[in-house]
UniProtKB/Swiss-Prot annotation:
<dbReference type="GO" id="GO:0006412">
    <property type="term" value="P:translation"/>
</dbReference>
<comment type="subunit">
    <text>Heterotrimer of A, B and C subunits.</text>
</comment>
<keyword id="KW-0067">ATP-binding</keyword>
<dbReference type="GO" id="GO:0006450">
    <property type="term" value="P:regulation of translational fidelity"/>
</dbReference>
<keyword id="KW-0436">Ligase</keyword>
<protein>
    <recommendedName>
        <fullName>Glutamyl-tRNA(Gln) amidotransferase subunit C</fullName>
        <ecNumber>6.3.5.-</ecNumber>
    </recommendedName>
</protein>
<dbReference type="GO" id="GO:0005524">
    <property type="term" value="F:ATP binding"/>
</dbReference>
<dbReference type="InterPro" id="IPR036113">
    <property type="entry name" value="Asp/Glu-ADT_sf_sub_c"/>
</dbReference>
<dbReference type="GO" id="GO:0070681">
    <property type="term" value="P:glutaminyl-tRNAGln biosynthesis via transamidation"/>
</dbReference>
<keyword id="KW-0547">Nucleotide-binding</keyword>
<dbReference type="GO" id="GO:0050567">
    <property type="term" value="F:glutaminyl-tRNA synthase (glutamine-hydrolyzing) activity"/>
</dbReference>
<comment type="function">
    <text>Allows the formation of correctly charged Asn-tRNA(Asn) or Gln-tRNA(Gln) through the transamidation of misacylated Asp-tRNA(Asn) or Glu-tRNA(Gln) in organisms which lack either or both of asparaginyl-tRNA or glutaminyl-tRNA synthetases. The reaction takes place in the presence of glutamine and ATP through an activated phospho-Asp-tRNA(Asn) or phospho-Glu-tRNA(Gln).</text>
</comment>
<comment type="similarity">
    <text>Belongs to the GatC family.</text>
</comment>
<dbReference type="Pfam" id="PF02686">
    <property type="entry name" value="GatC"/>
</dbReference>
<keyword id="KW-0648">Protein biosynthesis</keyword>
<dbReference type="GO" id="GO:0050566">
    <property type="term" value="F:asparaginyl-tRNA synthase (glutamine-hydrolyzing) activity"/>
</dbReference>
<dbReference type="InterPro" id="IPR003837">
    <property type="entry name" value="GatC"/>
</dbReference>
Amino acid sequence: MKITQEEVTHVANLSKLRFSEEETAAFATTLSKIVDMVELLGEVDTTGVAPTTTMADRKTVLRPDVAEEGIDRDRLFKNVPEKDNYYIKVPAILDNGGDA
């Protein structure tokens, strides 16, 4: 499946990213190769392979959910260039609060 430069540009715009024409062309080529590989994997005969089979021999180890003391707020805000009460002000990324 061929990914076009227009599709790369569209997704980049949704992500608020900008790329040069050369970068966009390179991304389109690379993404096309990745999609082709995924499609090729879809053709592999997995008859008799259990859906939950994994090659990794790992267990999920969860830690207990214990409240811990966080960062000292006043110390943190000493490094913040712009704040409003205890909120960190950052530049807007959406025009007029619009959607992505």
